Curated annotation (Swiss-Prot):
One of its GO terms (biological process) is aromatic amino acid family biosynthetic process. InterPro entries: Chorismate_synth, Chorismate_synth_AroC_sf, Chorismate_synthase_CS. Keywords: Amino-acid biosynthesis, Aromatic amino acid biosynthesis, FAD, Flavoprotein, FMN, Lyase, NADP. NADP(+) binds at R40, R46. Residues 101-120 are annotated as: Disordered. The lineage of its organism: Bacteria, Bacillati, Actinomycetota, Actinomycetes, Bifidobacteriales. Pathway: Metabolic intermediate biosynthesis; chorismate biosynthesis; chorismate from D-erythrose 4-phosphate and phosphoenolpyruvate: step 7/7. Homotetramer. This reaction introduces a second double bond into the aromatic ring system. GO terms for cellular component: cytosol. This is Chorismate synthase. Its EC number is 4.2.3.5. FMN binds at R134, S135, S136, Q258, A259, G303, K318, P319, I320, P321, S322, R344. NCBIfam families: aroC (TIGR00033), PRK05382.1 (NF003793). The gene is aroC.
């Protein structure tokens, strides 16, 4: 069983990520992880932190000479700003009182749309600092690191490849997903070269203009992202229990990314507006004599199982709640009306969210692939998968 967990705070000494259940023999290096984390920092509209934040990575366990060895893989991502926060975020009690000002000023004006107020209520804090430190999207660096390990596993065993892109930001760009061309894995370099991670140059300019407008207005923007997975064989996931459906797991994984407010598979909500005769993917016999689909409205999943088509996961991200134009709130110390705290943040992080969602999709697919095929080594997993596909009648492959 593949399991993963992350630990660490936004301004703590380091983030730590661990993944357990991977087979031995996956080729993965520190350089791979560093490259993946660099992709997360890309994107027009990111804040100042992205300019000086360096992800210093250490592979702590589970990898030897660039290959997994079957034991849990642990990865540390050091916080280069830690020297500025050693007192504020000290794990141990301090011998002296810290002045309640500057970085250590109590954060008593919770932000609407953030975890601040509810987190303070839930855990009994009188300061939002402990809440925002863990709920911060900085934590997603850990998941991107683990997603890179999952990427290497999927590519090396079954040739499964994943790519993400941005459809729209702040309502600008490709607002009708039916008009979007699905990117291919070979488009990854071009996507990462785009300031907003799109292949559509017209949409790119529209999104950049909308971000510039938000900057001028001291505001933030959300958007819509899409992740596409190629090469997943039919039959990953199952219909026999609701919690084992692949689409349910993918939706949960992506919904768990900070600021994501909605997830759909394939045409999703558009399907609700179509008659049945126009909603489903009809089948035919292809030129090679095998069963093929005439469309992919289901997004590669039917009955909770992959059907062999590309898997398409789309998600909506809300605007970041740390807004320079501070929203109205209540100071929990005084009980009086106030303006919300404004922590350093981005105008938009939609391009980065696409990279994070990509990582979560990879982790989920890897989990379900291992559930289906098992294997203590990459070679064994690969043999099991090949045997499974070979067991189908020729016309069903």
């Amino acid at each position: 069983m593949l399991r993963w967990q992350t630990a660490g705070e936004s301004h703590g000494e380091a983030l730590v990520a661990m993944i357990e259940g991977l087979p031995a023999g996956i080729h993965v290096t520190t350089e791979d992880i560093v490259g993946a984390l660099a992709r997360r920092r890309l994107g027009y509209g990111r804040g100042a932190r992205m300019k000086f934040e360096q992800d210093k990575v250490r592979m702590l366990t589970g990898v030897r000479f660039g290959e997994t060895i079957g034991s849990p893989v642990a990865i540390e991502i050091a916080n280069t700003e830690w020297p500025k926060w050693t007192e504020v975020m000290s794990a141990d009690p301090l011998d002296h009182d810290i002045p309640r000002e500057g970085r250590n000023a109590p954060l008593s004006r919770p932000r609407p749309g953030h975890a601040d107020l509810t987190g303070m209520r839930k855990y009994g804090f009188d300061d939002a600092r402990p809440v925002l430190e863990r709920s911060s999207a900085r934590e997603t660096a850990s998941r991107v690191a683990l997603g890179e390990v999952a990427k290497q596993f999927l590519e090396q065993t079954l040739g499964i490849r994943t790519v993400s892109h941005v459809l729209s930001i702040g309502g600008a760009g490709i607002t009708d997903p039916q008009n979007a061309v699905l990117p291919k894995p070979e488009d990854l370099e071009a996507l990462d070269a785009s300031p907003v991670r799109t292949l559509d140059k017209t949409a790119e300019q529209q999104m950049i203009a909308r971000i510039d407008e938000a900057k001028e207005n001291a505001d933030t923007l959300g958007g819509v992202i899409e992740v596409v997975v190629y090469g997943v064989p039919a039959g990953i996931g199952t219909y026999v229990e609701s919690d084992r459906r692949l689409d349910a797991a993918l939706a949960s994984a992506v919904m768990g990314v900070q600021a994501i407010k909605g997830v759909e598979i394939g045409d999703g909500f558009l399907e609700a507006m179509r008659p049945g005769s126009q909603a489903h993917d009809e089948m035919a016999v292809g030129d090679d004599g095998r069963i093929t689909r005439l469309s992919n409205r289901a997004g590669g999943i039917e009955g909770g199982m992959s059907n062999g088509q590309p898997i398409v996961v789309r998600a909506a991200m809300k605007p970041i709640p740390s807004i320079p134009k501070a929203l109205r709130t209540v100071d929990v110390t005084t009980g009086e009306a106030a303006q919300a705290i404004n922590q350093r943040s981005d105008n938009t992080a939609v391009p980065a969210a696409a990279v994070v969602a990509e990582a979560m999709v990879r982790l989920t697919i890897a989990q379900y692939v291992l559930e289906k095929f098992g294997g203590d080594s990459v070679a064994e997993t690969k043999r099991n998968a090949e045997s499974y596909v070979a067991s189908w009648p020729e016309h069903m492959r």
